[in-house]
Amino acid sequence: TMTSTITRIAPTIIRVSDKTNWTFIEVKTSDGVLGVGEATLYGQEEAMRALAGKFEGDLKGKPLSAIEDLAEATSASTDQAQRAVISALEQASWDIRGKQEGKPVHELLGGTKNTQIPIYANINRRTVDRSLAGFEASGRAAVDAGFNLLKIAPFDGLHPDIGRDGDAL
């Protein structure tokens, strides 16, 4: 209901592979409704766990709308972990609202706009052989499985401080 308050914020970190952890943030309200949001940001799990604890302290006992207030107040933040956790809190709040109102979230956000959406295969994590041939084999496997859009990140060993020509900036 609109008068329910936040009673718990808890992160769950799931080890999916040696390269991947998924992070979910759960928000529970005083009327027992549980909402879930996703905050995956590899390598930042402990920072996100700490932020979830901090935000639980800040938001516990407050109405769900306090999450929107937090998002607006921190919208200029460049802290990736903070942005990921706040995004997950917003997702969880929409999940809760949908459950409380008995409506799907997409309806709360304005309704169906498209009946079909394109999907892609992210072949980055599955590609153990990081050579060109390895990426090609992964790409072919995805195409053979019916995908016509692919996502990869073949940038192992490159860092943001390296310029386009390979020189340090």
Predicted regions: what they are:
Residues 4, 87, 115, 145:
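Structured loop/turn residues at beta-strand edges in well-structured enzyme cores
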Residues 10-12, 105, 136-137:
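Glycine-rich, charged/polar anion/phosphate-binding loops
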Residues 2-36, 40-41:
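Structured beta-strand/loop patches that form or line metal/cofactor-binding pockets in enzymes
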Residues 116-169:
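Metal-dependent enolase-superfamily TIM-barrel catalytic cores that perform enediolate-based chemistry
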Residues 28-101:
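Metal- or metallocofactor-binding catalytic centers and their adjacent structured scaffolds
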Residues 21-23, 53, 117:
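Residues at beta-strand starts and edge strands
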Residues 13, 81-83, 126-127, 133:
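A generic structural signal for short
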Residues 90-130:
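Glycine-rich, aromatic-flanked loop segments that form ligand/cofactor-binding clefts
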